[in-house]
Amino acid sequence: VCGNVKEDEGTIDAPIGRHPVDRKKMAINEKNGKPAVTHYKVLKRFGKYTYMQFKLETGRTHQIRVHMASIGHPLLGDELYSKNCPFKHLQGQTLHARTIGFIHPHTKEYMEFSAPLPKYFDDLLQKL
C-alpha cells in the first residue's frame, strides 16, 4: 500500500456501498452500506510503501481497496481509488489472494486453494 502504515496490525470495520457520484466505485457508506470488516497486518515496511496481509470477514466489492483508501493508504498503483500514489508500469494490481477458502455450495465441504505471488508482484517487492 502507499505510505508507511504505523500500526503493525488492526481492523477496519466500516460499511461499504455504492459511491454516491461515481457508479464504478464503492465507498464507505454509513447510511446505506453493508457491513464490511477487514483485518490487516504489516509484513514489511519500505519507507514510502508497506507490504501487508489482509483477512476478510466479509467479501464486499473492492473491500480491501476501499478500506485502505479510507485510512489514507490506498493500494499501490490503484488508479480507481488512488490519484496521489501513482506507480507506472505495473502488469497487474498489487493485490493477490494467496489463500482463499469457502464451503462448497453442494457438498458443504470446506475447500481451500493457495497460489504463489505472480512474478511481476515478486519482482516489484524485490525492487522496493
Describe the role of every protein-language-model region:
Residues 1-128:
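RNA pseudouridine synthases
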